[in-house]
Design a protein with these regions (language model features):
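S-adenosylmethionine/decaboxylated-SAM
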Residues: 1-140
């Protein structure tokens, strides 16, 4: 984030989860809300406020650059699948995708993991790193 020459784009509603999510505990719709308040961020970080399903398509039409890195912290299947389908044409060999809640909790195979498996063939990516629940892939 400190490289002021590169613009980092983020998408957030600041309203929390748009549907319930069960990890190790129950997280109801709206959990993780920031009460629509945007945090203070460096000048090179631009936030597109609103639900990603309502903001991403127009952003991608206006910004046709290739996507080098995408951190997906959408928790649930539906928004993750939506984003993956929309950004796929702008990915290239070497693009990195980081999934924040990829595995290691109840029903994980029905969420971000499922969205990845339904959007990409096995030979289109490789796993490059794993964290507690996170996974990173590189587009081939």
């Amino acid at each position: 984030l400190s490289d002021q020459k590169r613009i980092i784009y983020g998408f957030d509603s600041f309203e929390g989860l748009d549907e319930e999510w069960i990890s190790t505990d129950y997280n109801p719709k709206g959990k993780f809300s920031l009460s629509k308040k945007q945090p203070n961020l460096p000048k090179n970080v631009k936030i597109i406020k609103g639900r990603v399903e309502e903001t991403l398509e127009n952003f991608l039409k206006e910004n046709k650059n290739k996507i080098v890195f995408c951190h997906l912290d959408l928790d649930n299947y539906s928004p993750t699948k939506f984003v993956l389908q929309k950004i796929k044409p702008q990915l290239f060999p070497g693009s990195i995708l980081l999934f924040d809640e990829f595995y290691g909790y109840q029903n994980w195979k029905d969420q971000e993991y499922r969205a990845l498996k339904e959007t990409f063939k096995e030979d289109e990516y490789k796993y490059i790193a794993f964290g507690k629940r996170q996974a990173s892939i590189e587009i081939l």
